[in-house]
Structure formats: structure tokens, C-alpha cells
A protein has these predicted regions:
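Short structured motifs
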Residues: 1-2, 62-68, 79-81
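HotDog/MaoC-like acyl-thioester-processing domains
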Residues: 2-9, 13, 73-77, 85-166
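Active-site-flanking beta-strand signature of metal-NTP-handling nucleotidyl enzymes
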Residues: 14-18
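Short, ordered coil/turn segments that flank beta-strands lining enzyme active or ligand-binding pockets
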Residues: 22, 26, 122-123
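A conserved, well-ordered hydrophobic junction motif at loop->secondary-structure transitions
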Residues: 24-37
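Active-site helix/loop of acyl-thioester processing domains in fatty-acid/polyketide metabolism
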Residues: 34-54
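Small beta-barrel nucleic-acid-binding modules, principally OB-folds
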Residues: 54-74
Length: 166
């Protein structure tokens, strides 16, 4: 699968949610955990689309960062947009941005998250994923930033594993 190349647009996915009381905490603000579940689901869809197979097994390996900029309230409609930013051998970094204000031209960014998912075979072992061909300047910048985050993650993982041996 590694010899296949995909674009960011090939796996772009979106999801909209109308927020109900069951999604709210006691302050009337969207539960962070509920939002995380939706982010993880959308990231899985993006990853499967990048692999080109809706049956492809993928798993969340890392939630790199989740930044909540503004709260979301009951009756808000949130729009989540997910896209690939970087791919390794078997891993895919996915950015998801969440907006409110979907009925007007001035959407407000309320959340940005980076998740890393890994493609797995039927035995749970990592498998190669298609390469990513970033087309626009913004996609190329995101790719390079994702590459740097991947290097940092690998170094941190090696450090933790080495510490466990002591």
C-alpha cells in the first residue's frame, strides 16, 4: 500500500452535531469527554478513507493535543472538519478543527485537536499506509510540522521505554 499516494482532499471528512442537554455539563457547556469521543470517531473515518478501505482496522495511538478555545452550548451546531496532516509508515496524524456558527459566514474556531492513528492488519500488527502528497502551501507547512511532531513523539517514546528498563 506504501506505493500509493493520496492527497489531503482524498480523506477529508466532516461531521455536524446539534448539541442537546445530554451533551452538557452542569454549567450548560459541552462535556469535553463527549467532544473527545466525536473527535476520535471522525479521526477514525479520516484514517480509513486515507487507507482507501472502510474495513481497514485503525486504532488511536496518541492524542497529541486538544485545545479548547471557546465553550460550546446547548442548541449550538458544531461542525468538525478532519484532515490528514502527516503520514509515517503505518501512522497517520489527523487534525480536527471544530467550529460554531455554521449558518453564517463568520464561523468561530472553538477547538483544534491532533490525533495519531495506526493502521493494523487482522492480527493487530501495523501495516503500511499510502504516502501523502501535500498540494497547497498550507498542506506542505502542516506536513512539515507533523513530521517534526512525529520525531518528537518517537524520541519521547524511546526515552520512556528506556526508563522502563531501569
Amino acid at each position: 500500500m506504501k506505493d500509493i499516494t493520496k492527497t489531503v482532499a482524498d480523506s477529508f471528512s466532516g461531521s455536524s452535531k446539534l448539541l442537546f442537554p445530554k451533551h452538557m455539563n452542569n454549567e450548560g457547556i459541552l462535556y469535553g469527554g463527549q467532544h473527545l469521543m466525536w473527535l476520535d470517531e471522525l479521526a477514525g473515518i479520516v484514517a480509513k478513507r486515507h487507507c482507501g478501505n472502510e474495513k481497514q482496522r485503525v486504532t488511536t495511538a496518541c492524542i497529541e493535543s486538544v485545545d479548547f478555545y471557546k465553550p460550546c452550548y446547548q442548541s449550538d451546531i458544531i461542525d468538525m472538519q478532519g484532515f490528514i496532516t502527516y503520514v509515517g509508515n503505518s501512522s497517520m496524524e489527523i487534525c480536527i478543527e471544530t467550529y460554531t456558527g455554521g449558518f453564517c459566514d463568520n464561523k468561530t474556531l472553538v477547538n483544534r485537536a491532533y490525533l495519531v492513528l495506526v493502521a493494523l492488519d487482522d492480527n493487530g500488527h501495523p501495516v503500511t499506509v499510502p504516502r501523502l502528497n501535500p498540494a497547497s502551501i498550507q498542506e506542505k507547512e502542516r506536513y512539515e510540522a507533523g513530521k517534526q511532531r512525529s520525531i518528537i513523539r518517537k524520541n519521547e517514546r524511546m526515552f520512556v521505554l528506556e526508563q522502563g528498563d531501569k
